[in-house]
Each structure stands twice: as C-alpha cells, then as structure tokens.
Design a protein with these regions (language model features):
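Long, compositionally biased interface segments
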Residues: 174-220
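Long, charged N-terminal interaction/targeting segments
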Residues: 1-104, 192
C-alpha cells in the first residue's frame, strides 16, 4: 500500500510576506495590486484570488529563512519553494500544482491544484463566518488515511478542498516524498498519514504507544 505525507516547514512565518512591503516606519503596507483581494471586514486575503489574478507578484519581498532551507511559509499562508525544488518537481513530472515567481528572488509561490475531499474528519470552527466575504475559519489537520481522500495518481501533490486560515495543507504521495528526499531537498518535515490503528496509538500519546508507530517522519 502506498504512503501519503503531509508537508510542514516549521519556519518563521512572520518574517516573510508576499502581499505586503516593508516601509521605513517598520510597518507593512499592502501592495496596490493585492488590495482588491483583502476583505475590508475581516482583513483576510483571498490567497486563491491573489495567485490566480493576471497580476504577477510584486518585486520587493525579502524572504528570510535559515541557511540552506528550500521551503518556507509566508505570513499570509502561502507555501514558498526555491527554484531548485521547482525544477525538481518539473523534471520528475510531478502533478497537482502551479507556481508563480516572486520577482528578483530565488523563491516561488506554490499553489496546490489537485484537491481531495475530507472523509471522517470534522474541522473545528471557533466563530461564525465573515458577513462580508463569507469565509469561515476552521482548524485542525487531517493526519490519518481515514480522515481524507487520496488521489489515484502516484506522482502528485494534493490538498483538501477547504483551506485553513494558515493556508493550504500540502500533501504528497510517497513517490514525490522520495524524489525530494533523494535529491537532497532541505527545510521541511514530511509526516506520514497514519492508518486507523496507528492513529489510535497517536491519540493515546504515551511513550509506549508512540514507539509502535514506525517510519512516521521523513526529514528534509
């Protein structure tokens, strides 16, 4: 049976913004081209609309990560990858994504286009949706195979149909995980989706139960 993984960067989100620019007074201001995609009521940016707009991303953002890292998250919730990782995905014909460059940097905004439904997974909602844009924030990540659908393709990235406030959750097939690991990609952790028995052990959260779960993580 194939394995599937969730990608996490665990990088410092607050350092990196792609819809805002730094100014001399230490505050951030929104790029003019991105203003239409911010809700004036809840101030959430529609990341899908920003990515799919005809406008390119603005030059100016400084992407700050620890040395050697090739994955990052922006403050808005965009997933960022370096050019080398993008070339790897293209060379190995990985499917399920689109990418746009951030001008004058070695970084690209990654958008997952292959979506799958949730199964036995109930998101947590803290408050009603925005009365203007309608978005309702949910929390929680599907980390088990019984909680989320998986693609039929074996060489693809994928994501749930619904997007958390923190951005898209990036999932990948085992083949893609091995491509990244085998080619020395750096700066992320891949967490394998658990079967139902393993998930029960993880929920127990005891040292004895955790030891039963084998080969759960791939470190990049």
């Amino acid at each position: 049976m194939s394995a599937y993984f969730w990608l996490a960067t665990y990088d410092e989100r607050d350092n990196n913004w792609v819809t805002m620019q730094e100014n001399l007074h230490g505050a951030c201001s929104v790029f003019q081209s991105c203003i239409p995609h911010f809700c004036r009521a809840c101030h959430r940016v529609d990341k899908k609309a920003v990515f799919e707009s005809k406008e390119t991303f603005e030059p100016g953002p400084q992407i700050r990560v620890r040395a050697g890292r090739e994955f990052a998250d922006s403050g808005e919730g965009f997933t960022l990858i370096r050019t080398r990782v993008l070339k790897l995905l293209r060379r190995h014909r990985v499917a399920g994504y689109a990418a746009k460059p951030i001008p004058f940097t070695d970084w690209h905004v990654l958008r997952i286009t292959r979506t799958v439904p949730f199964k036995k997974f109930k998101p947590r909602y803290d408050e009603p949706g925005c009365k203007v844009c309608g978005y309702r924030a949910y929390y929680g990540i599907a980390l088990a195979l019984h909680q989320i659908g998986v693609p039929t393709e074996d060489n693809t990235l994928f994501t749930p149909e619904f997007e958390r406030p923190q951005g898209q959750d990036v999932f990948l097939t085992e083949k893609v995980a091995l491509i990244l690991k085998g080619n020395g990609a750096r700066g992320a952790e891949l967490q394998r989706l658990l079967n139902e028995e393993e998930y029960k052990w993880a929920e127990e959260d005891t040292p004895q139960a955790r030891r039963k779960i084998k080969s759960r993580f791939i470190l990049l």
